[in-house]
């Protein structure tokens, strides 16, 4: 088995010298071998946070995004596994619970609708958001399999469930059933 040494640098970032084991005799051109590959500096699979903060475009975009602190952005209080009983099941008013996750696109789509309804029905309904990533026990207990899922509770009992990104009219109709 003959070993050939490639001494010319290929157009992609590979070591300048590499040994290729081959059984046929003869030579080949590294330019011909790599000419079918696109010009590239390789893939970066990891990005450091420090490099992101140095990029002004990325840091500008990052400042306007609020995922984990969605309750701060929306004004709707958060409920979790530990506060579920006291805030939802023992509530005096009907309760509207939005089961969501920060990565969920449809959850982001209905968020402005839920905020608008929370303002409209303030004093008649209590509105809460439950992050299913941070509090997985409660969604499991109530059979939440997809998000967004909206549940309405009256006197601690689940009365209605709406699954998916639905219209404002659909949500308002469900709320009006329990006023």
Curated annotation (Swiss-Prot):
What does UniProt list as catalytic?
104, 107
- For this protein, what is any one GO molecular function term? salicylic acid binding
Query: Which SUPFAM superfamilies is this protein grouped with?
Result: Thioredoxin-like (SSF52833)
Query: Where is it located?
Result: Plastid, Chloroplast stroma
According to UniProt, residues marked as the site described as Contributes to redox potential value are 105-106
Q: Where is the transit peptide?
A: 1-48
Asked if the record carries the keyword Transit peptide, the reply is yes
What are the cysteine partners in each disulfide bond? 104-107
Any single GO CC term annotated in Swiss-Prot or TrEMBL for this entry: chloroplast envelope
Q: Where is the Thioredoxin domain?
A: 67-179
Superkingdom, according to UniProt? Eukaryota
**Main subcellular location:** plastid
Tell me if Chloroplast is a UniProt keyword of this record. yes
Pfam families per UniProt: Thioredoxin
Q: Which UniProt keywords apply?
A: Chloroplast, Disulfide bond, Electron transport, Plastid, Redox-active center, Transit peptide, Transport
Return the similarity comment: Belongs to the thioredoxin family. Plant M-type subfamily.
Q: Mind telling me which PANTHER family this protein's record contains?
A: GEO12009P1
- Recorded protein name is Thioredoxin M1, chloroplastic
